[in-house]
């Protein structure tokens, strides 16, 4: 049987052929307690109940950076297998223009294809400098951008599904900066038990020092809109062997095992993606 081909419309071909920017231009919480009339039974049960300290502020206020008002959007696009190359070409033709246009308060942080994990998937990370007002300003302007609307129409024909989240960055991580390649990237996603985000952040604020010797720490984020109590840690490595050696080295450092001991019970589900950057990605 002949392989399926991704049919590219004339409109999409026009987008491909428009001038592209040069590569150099892209450069926590709740508390749970059980009480009983039987004081002895209550005391005994309290030994086994995981307590989380009550907080007076939202975890987004306590954990995010105070000196910036950056908001991030992460997009996951599941692409028809026969359309992945065309999807990448279309993306590389259009998205850099938004990144470079100063009229749009948004910038590309990274663009990847998933190598190990969900196949035929693209992941995009955007930064909105100015928080929610910047996001809304950008969205309103895009409604009147004919080229972007044409791009979305063509892109929709290539997708099986898509989803996104709005994120804030942890205060103890460095802000993601463009980096030269070649690198592979690992996106480790943790779905936490509700009410444990503060505890997660406190432990990682102490533990991040064990994971910075090879400059592998790129960024750390937690969800605000979309699926909640989700954490994303983004790492960069030269290759898979470097990843293994770097992670093994962390286990030889006193204190890293303690972080794992205290954070593992907070996790409901975790996932790892190994990703390859697209040509337009500022993170190479």
From Swiss-Prot:
Modified residues (N6-acetyllysine): 65-66, 73, 80, 143, 146, 191, 193, 279
GO biological process: mitophagy; sensory perception of pain
Motif segment (SIFI-degron): 2-15
CC terms in the record's Gene Ontology section: membrane; mitochondrial inner membrane; mitochondrial matrix; mitochondrion; synaptic membrane
Post-translational modification: In response to mitochondrial stress, the precursor protein is ubiquitinated by the SIFI complex in the cytoplasm before mitochondrial import, leading to its degradation. Within the SIFI complex, UBR4 initiates ubiquitin chain that are further elongated or branched by KCMF1.
Phosphoserine: modified positions: 129
GO MF terms held by the record: protein-macromolecule adaptor activity
Transit peptide: 1-35
Modified residue annotations for N6-succinyllysine: 146, 193
Subcellular location: Mitochondrion matrix
UniProt keyword annotations, A-Z: Acetylation, Autophagy, Mitochondrion, Phosphoprotein, Transit peptide, Ubl conjugation
Position of the signal peptide: none
InterPro entries (alphabetical): Dimeric_a/b-barrel, NIPSNAP, NipSnap_domain
Function in brief: Protein involved in mitophagy by facilitating recruitment of the autophagy machinery required for clearance of damaged mitochondria. Accumulates on the mitochondria surface in response to mitochondrial depolarization and acts as a 'eat me' signal by recruiting proteins involved in selective autophagy, such as autophagy receptors (CALCOCO2/NDP52, NBR1, SQSTM1/p62, TAX1BP1 and WDFY3/ALFY) and ATG8 family proteins (MAP1LC3A, MAP1LC3B, MAP1LC3C, GABARAP, GABARAPL1 and GABARAPL2).
Subunit structure of this chain's protein: Interacts with CALCOCO2/NDP52, NBR1, SQSTM1/p62, TAX1BP1 and WDFY3/ALFY. Interacts with ATG8 family proteins (MAP1LC3A, MAP1LC3B, MAP1LC3C, GABARAP, GABARAPL1 and GABARAPL2).
Family: Belongs to the NipSnap family.
Protein name from the UniProt record: Protein NipSnap homolog 1
Source organism of this protein record: Mus musculus
């Amino acid at each position: 049987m002949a392989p399926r081909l991704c049919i590219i419309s004339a409109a999409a071909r026009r987008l491909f052929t428009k001038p592209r920017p040069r590569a150099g231009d892209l450069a926590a919480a709740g508390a749970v307690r059980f009480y009983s009339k039987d004081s002895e039974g209550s005391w005994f049960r309290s030994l086994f109940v995981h307590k989380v300290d009550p907080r007076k502020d939202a975890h987004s206020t306590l954990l995010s950076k105070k000196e910036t008002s950056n908001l991030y959007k992460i997009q996951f696009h599941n692409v028809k297998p026969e359309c992945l190359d065309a999807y990448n070409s279309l993306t590389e033709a259009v998205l850099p223009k938004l990144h470079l246009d100063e009229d749009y308060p948004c910038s590309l942080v990274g663009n990847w294809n998933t190598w190990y994990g969900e196949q035929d998937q693209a992941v995009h990370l955007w930064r909105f400098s100015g928080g929610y007002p910047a996001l809304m300003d950008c969205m309103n302007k895009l409604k009147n951008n004919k080229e972007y609307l044409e791009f979305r129409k063509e892109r929709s024909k290539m997708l099986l599904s898509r989803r996104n989240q709005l994120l804030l960055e942890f205060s103890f991580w460095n802000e993601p900066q463009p980096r030269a390649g070649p690198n592979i990237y690992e996106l480790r996603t943790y779905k936490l038990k509700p009410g444990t985000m503060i505890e997660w952040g406190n432990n990682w604020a102490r533990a991040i020092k064990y994971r910075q010797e090879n400059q592998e720490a790129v960024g750390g984020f937690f969800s605000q809109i979309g699926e909640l109590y989700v954490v994303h840690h983004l790492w960069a490595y030269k290759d898979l062997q470097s990843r293994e050696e770097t992670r093994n080295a962390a286990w030889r450092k006193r204190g890293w095992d303690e972080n794992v001991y205290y954070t593992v019970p907070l996790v409901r589900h975790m996932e790892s993606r190994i990703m390859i950057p697209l040509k337009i990605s500022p993170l190479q």
